[in-house]
């Protein structure tokens, strides 16, 4: 029953929750709960690769089992009350809430717009907000470098917070485990964002989460290329050329794809000082380029959602 009824409806309701309500309170946000678990386990474990492996197994299995249990309990509650329809509705609501927690359409757009606007008005204030999007030190960034950081993060997060969770949701929905798969991905992504750094205290313990994140984002990152090309058809060849030339210049095997695609569409240079430069023949990003990037990624988000919905209908 769940497998037959839910996948398409869950996606639509999850999207509506995201657009209308945005992010849930931190105390009730599954990703925040996952992050709390990661932090507590990190404090308990020695800084070794085996610790990262143990944390990965515990957090992923915990997220999957919790999602599985909550959905089935919701469905069973209605059945025990003598109403299968009530069970369907409860499971639909719980499933949609859990799925919504794995992506962030509205939050990503609004945060990028807020910081982009603030760069022009008060660069120092914008630097204080930039860590919400990027991990680099914003202290010495120029206006152009700050805009580049926003555009880079927006395009990279398009994969991590939109394409990847939708990809795994659709992929596993045929088995009735779409929400659980999206939660598993988000668990890996959260571990990577907390542990996947090359600092002395995290290099070993973060190794497994970082590699898992690379593996799970490999296909979605490359899918971002055709999606962004369709979102900007007049620049499709520029996007393709930029990706073919610059996708491998970033330390991550995946982030270069959406960032190079965005750079090709906008014609702007993107650079993390001392680490990489994408489209070095391009111009420095200007104020309107942040708005253009938000519009571009917004269209690509809609395409990803529409494609996911269409696939769920076809696979039903």
UniProtKB/Swiss-Prot annotation:
It holds the Pfam family CobD_Cbib. It is found in: Cell membrane. Pathway: Cofactor biosynthesis; adenosylcobalamin biosynthesis. Its main location: membrane. It comes from the Archaea. One of its GO terms (molecular function) is ABC-type vitamin B12 transporter activity. InterPro entries: Cobalamin_biosynth_CobD/CbiB. It is a multi-pass membrane protein. The chain crosses the membrane at residues 1-21, 50-70, 89-109, 165-185, 294-314. GO terms for biological process: cobalamin biosynthetic process. Keywords: Cell membrane, Cobalamin biosynthesis, Membrane, Transmembrane, Transmembrane helix. One of its GO terms (cellular component) is plasma membrane. HAMAP family: CobD_CbiB (MF_00024). Belongs to the CobD/CbiB family. Converts cobyric acid to cobinamide by the addition of aminopropanol on the F carboxylic group. This is Probable cobalamin biosynthesis protein CobD. The lineage of its organism: Archaea, Methanobacteriati, Methanobacteriota, Stenosarchaea group, Methanomicrobia. The gene is cobD.
């Amino acid at each position: 029953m769940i497998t037959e009824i839910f996948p398409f409806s869950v996606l639509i309701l999850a999207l509506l929750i995201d657009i209308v309500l945005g992010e849930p309170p931190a105390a009730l946000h599954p990703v925040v709960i996952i992050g709390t678990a990661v932090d507590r386990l990190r404090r308990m474990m020695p800084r070794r690769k085996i610790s990262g492996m143990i944390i990965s197994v515990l957090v992923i299995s915990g997220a999957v089992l919790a999602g599985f249990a909550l959905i089935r309990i919701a469905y069973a509650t209605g059945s025990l009350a003598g109403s299968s329809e009530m069970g369907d509705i409860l499971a639909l609501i719980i499933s949609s809430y859990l799925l919504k927690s794995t992506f962030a359409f509205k939050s990503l757009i609004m945060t990028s717009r807020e910081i982009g606007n603030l760069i022009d008005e008060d660069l120092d204030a914008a630097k204080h907000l930039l860590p919400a999007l990027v991990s680099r030190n914003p202290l010495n960034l120029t206006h152009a470098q700050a805009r580049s950081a926003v555009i880079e993060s927006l395009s990279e997060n398009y994969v991590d917070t939109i394409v990847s969770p939708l990809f795994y949701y659709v992929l596993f929905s045929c088995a009735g485990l779409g929400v659980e798969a999206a939660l598993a991905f988000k668990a890996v992504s959260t571990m990577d964002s907390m542990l996947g750094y090359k600092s002395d205290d995290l290099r070993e313990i973060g190794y497994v989460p970082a590699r898992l994140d690379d593996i799970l984002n490999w296909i979605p990152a490359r899918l971002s290329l055709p999606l962004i090309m369709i979102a900007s058809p007049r620049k499709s060849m520029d996007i393709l050329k930029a990706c073919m030339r610059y996708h491998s210049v970033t330390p991550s095997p995946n982030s270069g794809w959406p960032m190079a695609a965005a750079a090709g569409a906008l014609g702007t240079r993107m650079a993390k000082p001392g680490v990489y430069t994408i489209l070095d023949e391009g111009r420095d990003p200007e104020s309107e380029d942040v708005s253009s990037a938000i519009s571009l990624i917004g269209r690509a988000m809609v395409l990803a959602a529409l494609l996911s919905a269409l696939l769920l209908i076809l696979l039903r």
